[in-house]
């Protein structure tokens, strides 16, 4: 099942967005259509207002056997096929870390994708991310994937590392 998510960062055109779901070739493939309003000058995706026009505010993506719930403002690789190659290469490079005495750190972890993909090779994985919503998503995704050796901490990486016991 291929799910599509349309996040339009525009100032109008809601009718056009809704017409996408009515297109016969695309009908039934959208997890959600959101209208994101941002009238400020910015080089990042930010929202002055987000309106759900259709469906839900998230979609699911599967990478290397793990399933991730992705929302509009989650950090997630946009090219999933390339991400799988990259992450598989990283897993192959790391290999088996020798069991329960090894800890992997995923710094600036976002929604914890890399941490979760490394979890089977390590005794423990610690992800650190400053965006609290991303940390909550990482915790939920890890639980949904049955990974009990992942810990995600919300905070500034430089400050959190001073406080972490596993170094």
Predicted regions and their residues:
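Accessory RNA-recognition modules of RNA-modification enzymes
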Residues: 1-167
């Amino acid at each position: 099942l291929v799910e599509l998510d349309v996040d339009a960062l525009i100032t109008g055109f809601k009718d056009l967005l809704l017409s996408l779901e009515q297109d016969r070739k695309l009908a039934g493939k959208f997890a959600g259509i959101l209208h994101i309003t941002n009238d400020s000058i910015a080089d990042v995706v930010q929202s002055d207002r987000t309106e759900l026009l259709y469906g839900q505010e998230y979609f699911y993506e599967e990478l290397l056997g793990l399933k991730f719930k992705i929302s509009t403002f989650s950090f997630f690789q946009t090219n999933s096929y390339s991400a799988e190659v990259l992450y598989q290469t990283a897993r192959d490079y790391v290999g088996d870390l020798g069991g329960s005495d090894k800890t992997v750190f995923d710094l600036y972890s976002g929604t914890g994708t890399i941490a979760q993909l490394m979890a089977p090779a390590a005794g423990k994985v610690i992800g650190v991310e400053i965006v609290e919503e991303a940390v909550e998503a990482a915790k939920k995704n890890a639980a949904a994937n049955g990974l009990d050796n992942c810990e995600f901490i919300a905070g500034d990486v430089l400050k959190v590392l001073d406080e972490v016991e596993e170094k």
